[in-house]
Amino acid sequence: MNRSYRIEDNNSNSFIPSYSGTNGAVATHSNLSSMTAYNILNQDRGNAFDAAAGAMLVEGLVNPQMFGMGGEGVMILKPKNQNPVVLNGNTLSPRKFNFLNLVTRGFTEVPDEGVLCAGVPAAFSSIFRMLQLYGTLDFRTISKYAKEYAKEG
């Protein structure tokens, strides 16, 4: 295992392990998320989309300020032998929301704060959609690492 230091090695710095290979690359904020993606690719024989989903689930657990199930996000995906695809995981307006409802309440635009500007979180559903379209493993396999970290620490 190699060591990856944040600054020059002076024997007092903390380190996180770095993993390297010849058939792919994984980069996440947390080494636990990276290791999850690595394991999904190498032990579980998943594809890059499976690995990304597993890493996102772990990242939401260990770094909820960076990625959360109640949030949003956009993914640019590149399936093999296909053009890139954008998967929009931004929040959705509630079904019954429309501008007329705002106008009748005296608003001329969507407010910056409060329940009227809140959207339905779509991060989690975008992970599922990515797996439906491009994944090869079942959700139980992909989520087992996040479950283990949540249960065992």
Regions found by a protein language model. Give the residues of each.
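Noncatalytic scaffold domains of N-terminal-nucleophile
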Residues: 2-43, 48-153
